[in-house]
């Protein structure tokens, strides 16, 4: 068994054990950060995807922070 095969086995077995807790940690920080600042990440207006209300276009590739009160609840897209 050469080094490359050993490496593949290690990655297959150990990688999920490292990545999964890391993802949870990132999500936890993300949640904490947003609840503290009372902000949500909301799609920035651009020319890519239409948002039904008010006919504004939103891109889901570029995000901007808008206050929670003005965020997903009324489904609006805001310019930066």
Swiss-Prot record:
* TM stretches of this protein: 10-29
Recorded topology in the membrane: Single-pass membrane protein
What keywords does the record list, in alphabetical order?
Membrane, Transmembrane, Transmembrane helix
* Gene Ontology annotations for the cellular component aspect, listed alphabetically: membrane
Q: Where in the cell is it found?
A: Membrane
Q: What is this protein called?
A: Uncharacterized membrane protein YOR034C-A
């Amino acid at each position: 068994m050469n080094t490359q095969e050993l490496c593949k086995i290690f990655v297959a077995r150990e990688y999920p054990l490292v990545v999964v807790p890391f993802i949870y940690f990132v999500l936890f920080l993300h949640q904490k950060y947003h609840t503290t600042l009372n902000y949500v990440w909301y799609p920035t207006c651009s020319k890519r995807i239409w948002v039904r209300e008010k006919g504004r276009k939103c891109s889901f590739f570029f995000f901007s922070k808008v206050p929670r009160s003005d965020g997903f609840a009324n489904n609006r897209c805001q310019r930066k």
